[in-house]
Amino acid sequence: MASAGGGDCEGAGPEADRPHQRPFLIGVSGGTASGKSTVCEKIMELLGQNEVDHRQRKLVILSQDRFYKVLTAEQKAKALKGQYNFDHPDAFDNDLMHRTLKNIVEGKTVEVPTYDFVTHSRLAETTVVYPADVVLFEGILVFYSQEIRDMFHLRLFVDTDSDVRLSRRVLRDVQRGRDLEQILTQYTTFVKPAFEEFCLPTKKYADVIIPRGVDNMVAINLIVQHIQDILNGDICKWHRAGANGRSHKRTFPEPGEHPAVLASGKRSHLESSSRPH
């Protein structure tokens, strides 16, 4: 068992060292290799989080990838050949995911599984995630299940060009020891169709859509400001807005596009109006 202090799980410190609390839960979705984890890491960096002194952390990052189901021998054989669909909703242990998130929202310390992408198996080792003020939960299908989707106080969707996502996916899977031909076959057979059928339709549930992911620093900075408001005790305004039926939904435009219309009806210039050559 390991305490959260690196990788995609960042802990906030032992419960004995901090008061019991109910975290503000943020869902971060988007297609494969869209930059979800990078966006989360940038948010953590801008909030001044430190990988060494994890006891002082107020923000946790948790990946949906940790909740892949334990495969049968037949399924594992298919996975090793690139013939198993890891982008389908049924590939995830949604019951365990829901229970874990429920405990996190209740301010409890939880143990999350560790998944090995080389052997396609869940390891015996778990990671301890301590209570935090803000929890970022990222994954391709975190908005697919209504039961899980409704748990988020804020929903972000990272919207990245499909060609960019494919190139990132290839590089990532090659680094995981995968064969290039197998990667491309899996992408065209499973990944792309699953994105169009299961992931992309959930974009409509996002409160904030972030074009170009971490490259869109205007969007990232505004989101960080909202999180800072929460950390500073201004979380109530979000709950009040939700109770009054007001939507937080907004899309951060590309350079050269018209500025987004905010919930208040006012227009706000979020990026430069000139597109770089």
Curated annotation (Swiss-Prot):
InterPro entries assigned: P-loop_NTPase, PRK/URK, Uridine_kinase-like
Top-level EC class: transferase
Gene Ontology molecular function: ATP binding; cytidine kinase activity; uridine kinase activity
Signal peptide span: none
GO cellular component annotations of the record: cytoplasm
Pathway stated in the Swiss-Prot or TrEMBL entry: Pyrimidine metabolism; CTP biosynthesis via salvage pathway; CTP from cytidine: step 1/3; Pyrimidine metabolism; UMP biosynthesis via salvage pathway; UMP from uridine: step 1/1
Region (Disordered): 1-29, 246-277
The entry's keywords: ATP-binding, Kinase, Nucleotide-binding, Phosphoprotein, Transferase
Enzyme Commission designation: 2.7.1.48
Residues with the Phosphothreonine modification: T251
Organism superkingdom: Eukaryota
Similarity annotation: Belongs to the uridine kinase family.
NCBIfam families, per the entry: PRK05480.1, udk
Protein name: Uridine-cytidine kinase 1
Source organism (scientific name): Bos taurus
Gene designation per UniProt: UCK1
